[in-house]
Amino acid sequence: MLTTDRLVNTLNLELLTGEEGLDRPIKNTDISRPGLEMAGYFSHYASDRIQLLGTTELSFYNLLPDEEKKGRMRKLCRPETPAIIVTRGLEPPEELIQASQETHTPIIVAKDATTSLMSRLTTFLEHELAKTTSLHGVLVDVYGVGVLITGDSGIGKSETALELVKRGHRLVADDNVEIKEITKDELVGKPPKLIEHLLEIRGLGIINVMTLFGAGSILTEKQIRLNINLENWNKNKLYDRVGLNEETLKILDTEITKKTIPVRPGRNVAVIIEVAAMNYRLNIMGINTAVEFNERLNEEIVRNSHKSEE
């Protein structure tokens, strides 16, 4: 559970008052700037969000009659409010401090500009409060592309990852990949702390990739862009030989590109995955070899049909 205390420590913010409320949970990634509330409109006050008070809000507040100031701040400090942050190093109003002491609402001061701090907070909250899941597989950074290797147990996922590491790529997680959906279409995978940097090879045991290959051979987390699913070669199955068929794998609410690679003796799976990663990058750049080949093939068919008619 994300609490105000963790927010303060992670972002190096300064707590002014309301220490008793540091254990309040933060459940919302949205941040509020209570401008209308300063004017007295609390009908739709999002009290469960972190509140930011910048120059605009406080300059308006200072124009209020003295008899209204205390009531506004008391309404602002609710039991469910995680924190009220005063930005730009501004001095918090005395009425706010009093309301904080009465309701134990944490008051935090920051030197950052309001917009800059809002950006930092949003990034932090989206990461911490993102939806999570875990998958059985191996995550490797191949040419800058986060490749999630999946398949049945014993198919050779870890051995393939070891070969990729030897070829200069970086291991993120083996066996169990913890996945967070940071935003729409952005999945980030990382290993559980218990098996960080470790790789299990049947017949050899558990090896520490960072110790064997150096710090450049591992990553703590990586955005997942491509899924390579390994399966035993099935002679009765028609595999994609051109690349026009687009498969996807849905993880949480995000779909990523999926490629199914049949495995049998003599196939260098690590090299195939390298080529798949490079080809994925080309596709992002708008270069699709399969589509170009299909267009050339259609043009050739049209030319031949015209010749036969003549």
Swiss-Prot record:
GO molecular function per UniProt: ATP binding; magnesium ion binding; phosphorelay sensor kinase activity; protein serine/threonine kinase activity; protein serine/threonine/tyrosine kinase activity
Catalytic activity field: [HPr protein]-L-serine + ATP = [HPr protein]-O-phospho-L-serine + ADP + H(+); [HPr protein]-O-phospho-L-serine + phosphate + H(+) = [HPr protein]-L-serine + diphosphate
Keywords: ATP-binding, Carbohydrate metabolism, Kinase, Magnesium, Metal-binding, Multifunctional enzyme, Nucleotide-binding, Serine/threonine-protein kinase, Transferase
The keyword Phosphoprotein is assigned to this record: no
Amino-acid positions noted as binding ATP in the UniProt annotation, renumbered to this chain: G151, D152, S153, G154, I155, G156, K157, S158
Other known facts: Both phosphorylation and phosphorolysis are carried out by the same active site and suggest a common mechanism for both reactions.
UniProt similarity note: Belongs to the HPrK/P family.
Quaternary context: Homohexamer.
Stated role: Catalyzes the ATP- as well as the pyrophosphate-dependent phosphorylation of a specific serine residue in HPr, a phosphocarrier protein of the phosphoenolpyruvate-dependent sugar phosphotransferase system (PTS). HprK/P also catalyzes the pyrophosphate-producing, inorganic phosphate-dependent dephosphorylation (phosphorolysis) of seryl-phosphorylated HPr (P-Ser-HPr).
Note on domains (UniProt): The Walker A ATP-binding motif also binds Pi and PPi.
Protein name (Swiss-Prot/TrEMBL): HPr kinase/phosphorylase
Protein species of origin: Staphylococcus epidermidis (strain ATCC 35984 / DSM 28319 / BCRC 17069 / CCUG 31568 / BM 3577 / RP62A)
Name of the encoding gene: hprK
